Amino acid sequence: MNAYNKADSFSLESDSIKDVIHDYICWLSMTDEMRPSIGNVFKAMETFKIDAVRYYDGNIYDLAKDINAMSFDSFIRSLQNISSKKDKLTVYGTMGLLSIVVDINKGCDISNIKFAAGIIILMEYIFDDTDMSHLKVALYRRIQRRDDVDR
């Protein structure tokens, strides 16, 4: 995991959004005490949670509690649930929703690691290449905006 958690910059040409997301989900799955400090890349990833709250009409945390990737049946139900709301959430809100799901279920035992892995696999089904491109550009812009504010 340590490739992006402390990173302050992100390149559209050479960095992989999938790698960032995988590292970020692994970082989120840790307890707060175990999480290493983060740089601007993960700080920008955290802003997708705001999108989830903004784009979803109801209580995003209630929806997040219904997402489960621990069994095949619950994985399929979760996939259907998210896919049916994807137009309302947008790709940014969906990224934020899945981040909230992992954050709610964080911990240091093996079931939390399996849960995070299940969410990463769920993302592979939910996000297509266009979605990944949108996330990549959005992440880049959010980091740039943060840099502009910090100057």
UniProtKB/Swiss-Prot annotation:
It comes from the Viruses. Belongs to the orthopoxvirus OPG029 family. InterPro entries: Poxvirus_Bcl-2-like, Poxvirus_sf. Prevents establishment of cellular antiviral state by blocking virus-induced phosphorylation and activation of interferon regulatory factors 3/IRF3 and 7/IRF7, transcription factors critical for the induction of interferons alpha and beta. This blockage is produced through the inhibition of host TBK1, by binding host TBK1 adapter proteins TBKBP1 and AZI2, thereby producing a strong inhibition of the phosphorylation and activation of IRF3 and IRF7. Also acts as an inhibitor of the cellular response to type I IFN by interacting with host STAT2. Interacts with host TANK, TBKBP1 and AZI2; these interactions prevent interferon production. Interacts with host STAT2. This is IFN signaling evasion protein OPG029. Induction: Expressed in the early phase of the viral replicative cycle. Keywords: Early protein. It comes from Vaccinia virus (strain Copenhagen). It holds the Pfam family Poxv_Bcl-2-like. Coiled coil: none annotated. The keyword Nucleotide-binding does not apply.
